[in-house]
């Protein structure tokens, strides 16, 4: 009785020493009613406004730790937060439809310090054109990373104008675009800090006879990674690859043409390569042996190159003694086997990861790998007709450092799993898939003998459910397909 609740919010005036030119959010405090018979009095208690006293740099750090959705919500609080959030944004991904052109001035006036930009367009829509890309480059002169996906309306002229405005670019990734060699050369000639270049399905390069060579340009001195995927006439990038003396990683996938001769020239000129991926290329032992000049080679991926044999692998292994990761998928060609793997075991003693798909090693090579490669921690054997219980038992007994093992589509049975449960003391994860002779009873065996081991078991056969299973048993870290 005698009390009333007021809904009016009273804001206090800021002290003169706290006032500044920036706009601060206004805070209100609860009104505390004082009980009096006929007159209600209110006392206003002012809470300190610590947030508004934070410098812009500190506020930006807070925003950077938030999710994208939370950042958007924060930008609606006040004008200052909107400005700071826009200036501190590190990455922006946009639907690159043609109507984006009209939004460029307002959008990039807010995000005027953006370092990373992704522009994606779907196949059924008309993408942005040269005018929009040039407008973006004028607003984002500090851009260091650009990703273009299906921007089919961009031409060589647009890429050239972009390169003139964004000379600090360090990373460029483009896929399903239609500009050609002139546009790519403009990037290489105007972006001396470019370190990473990824090109996928560049439609502007069609005729091999008339195609303009790409590179090397000013970017050749700084490039460290080049990835080419599904590029017709990818050999046009030969001058760029050869001229990139500091190149560390080269990835070639599904690029047409014969690559043997070019790989030989590349290996002779670019000897500092540490990682090479060759996938679905027309390459033979000549091309596979070429990286033998790269004495610092640490990672080699050889995927679906049916013309490569043990001969090429031996030549590479004899000189590339720092090899740490070897990935071989020969697509059931059965031309790489014990001879090549024995050479790897003899010369590549630093091997840490080995993935064999469609390869048929026997106990001979596996035992030598286990004995010599004492640092081997990750091993995958997939689609092999020769990896059975004997080979798995050998691995269990000899691979002391092994931490992760994957076995798929191999003639392994419960006997091999039992040997595995008793061996490999440092093993932390095992994956067994589509090995039909392995039963789900191995799950109990691993649980009893190696309780901390993470096991993923899928034999490919339906599993009969046990009604008595469960109860107080701890949950197993085993994936069972039913």
Model regions and ranges:
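C-terminal capping region of solenoid repeat domains
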Residues: 2-45, 207-229, 234-303, 307-482
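N-terminal adaptor-interaction module of cullin-RING ubiquitin ligase components
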Residues: 1-163, 168-226, 237-242, 249, ...
């Amino acid at each position: 009785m005698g009390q009333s609740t007021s809904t009016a919010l009273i804001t206090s005036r800021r002290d003169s020493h706290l006032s500044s030119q920036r706009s601060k959010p206004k805070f209100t405090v609860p009104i505390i009613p004082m009980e009096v018979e006929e007159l209600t009095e209110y006392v206003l208690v002012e809470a300190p406004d610590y947030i508004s006293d934070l410098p812009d740099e500190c506020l930006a750090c807070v925003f950077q730790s938030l999710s994208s959705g939370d950042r958007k919500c924060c930008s609606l609080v006040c004008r200052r937060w909107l400005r700071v959030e826009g200036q501190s944004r590190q990455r922006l991904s946009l639907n690159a439809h043609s109507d984006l052109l009209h939004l460029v001035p307002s959008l990039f006036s807010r995000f005027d310090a953006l370092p990373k930009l992704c522009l994606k367009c779907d196949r059924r829509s008309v993408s942005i054109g040269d005018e929009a890309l040039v407008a973006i480059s004028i607003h984002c002169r500090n851009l260091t990373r650009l990703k273009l996906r299906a921007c089919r309306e961009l031409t060589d002229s647009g890429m050239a104008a972009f390169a003139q405005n964004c000379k600090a670019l360090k990373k460029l990734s483009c896929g399903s675009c239609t500009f050609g060699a002139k546009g790519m050369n403009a990037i290489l000639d105007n972006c001396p800090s470019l370190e990473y270049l990824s090109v996928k399905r560049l439609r502007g390069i069609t005729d091999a006879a008339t195609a303009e060579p790409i590179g090397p340009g000013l970017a050749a001195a700084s490039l460290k990674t080049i990835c080419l995927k599904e590029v017709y006439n990818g050999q046009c990038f030969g001058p760029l690859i050869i001229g990139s003396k500091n190149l560390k990683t080269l990835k070639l996938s599904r690029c047409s043409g014969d690559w043997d001769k070019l790989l030989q020239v590349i290996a002779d000129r670019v000897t500092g390569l540490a990682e090479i991926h060759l996938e679905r290329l027309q390459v033979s032992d000549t091309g596979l042996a070429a990286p033998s000049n790269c004495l610092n080679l640490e990672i080699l991926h050889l995927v679906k190159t049916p013309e490569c044999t043990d001969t090429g692998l031996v030549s590479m292994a004899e000189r590339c003694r720092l090899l740490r990761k070897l990935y071989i998928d020969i697509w059931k060609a059965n031309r790489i086997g014990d001879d090549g793997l024995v050479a790897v075991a003899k010369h590549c003693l630093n091997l840490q990861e080995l993935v064999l798909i469609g390869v048929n090693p026997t106990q001979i090579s596996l035992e030598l790998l286990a004995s010599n490669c004492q640092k081997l921690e990750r091993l995958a054997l997939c689609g092999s007709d020769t990896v059975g219980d004997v080979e798995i038992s050998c691995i269990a007994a000899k691979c002391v450092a092994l931490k992760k093992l994957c076995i798929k589509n191999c003639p392994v049975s419960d006997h091999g799993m039992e040997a595995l449960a008793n061996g490999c003391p440092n093993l932390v994860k095992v994956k067994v898939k589509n090995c039909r002779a392995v039963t789900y009873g191995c799950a109990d065996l691993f649980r009893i003998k190696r309780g901390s081991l993470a096991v993923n078991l899928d034999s490919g056969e339906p599993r009969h459910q046990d009604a008595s299973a469960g109860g107080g048993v701890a949950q197993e870290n085993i994936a069972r397909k039913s």
